């Protein structure tokens, strides 16, 4: 894993990159851990805004998964948001190996304005995207739990 705050310090622009995008706490890092079959590969947290860099994960010699910081986190400072916007713009505009974006949305809050903006961002840079609705499992009390 390699995290960068400046795209010039990113791994070589080769092979195939698939970017994981979405609002804070939409399940990007959890999905990455699931795909890699390693629960500790990407840092997860119940607190939004933990991923602060673009994190590159080498899956094979040819394939990288790229975990982006979540967007839409209201407590992010104006300066941090501006830096994040600049970083994302430089990533999407410069990476020739970027094949597609997987945009994660919590099924309880799908298609927020920030999700639409990310889709428009992908369209601007001609990056195909795949929307994925994630399910946040909530605790079901015993009396309401179905019997299977």
Where are these regions (language model features)?
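Conserved G1/Walker A P-loop phosphate-binding module
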Residues: 1-73
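Flexible beta-alpha connector loops of hexameric P-loop NTPases
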Residues: 71-81, 137
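Catalytic P-loop NTPase motifs of RecA-like helicase/translocase cores
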Residues: 72, 110-111
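Single conserved hydrophobic/aromatic residue that forms the stacking wall/gate
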Residues: 138-148
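Active-site glycine-centered loops adjacent to acidic/histidine catalytic or metal-binding residues
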Residues: 134
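Inter-motif core of Ras-like GTPase G domains
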Residues: 80-108, 120-127
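Hydrophobic "anchor" residues on beta-strands that sit immediately upstream
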Residues: 63-65, 102, 130
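Acidic (Asp/Glu) carboxylate-rich active-site/surface patches
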Residues: 115
């Amino acid at each position: 894993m390699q995290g960068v705050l400046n795209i010039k310090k990113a791994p070589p622009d080769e092979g195939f990159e698939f970017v994981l995008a979405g609002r804070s706490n939409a399940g990007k890092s959890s999905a990455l851990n699931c795909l890699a079959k390693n629960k500790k590969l990407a840092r997860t947290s119940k607190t939004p805004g933990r991923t602060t860099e673009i994190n590159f994960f080498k899956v094979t010699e040819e394939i990288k998964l790229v975990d982006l910081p979540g967007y839409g986190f209201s407590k992010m400072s104006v300066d941090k948001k501006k830096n994040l916007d600049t970083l994302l713009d430089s990533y999407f505009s410069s990476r020739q190996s970027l094949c597609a974006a997987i945009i994660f949305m919590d099924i309880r809050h799908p298609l927020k304005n920030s999700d639409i903006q990310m889709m428009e961002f992908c369209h601007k840079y001609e990056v195909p995207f795949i929307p994925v609705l994630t399910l946040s499992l909530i605790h079901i009390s015993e009396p309401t739990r179905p019997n299977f």
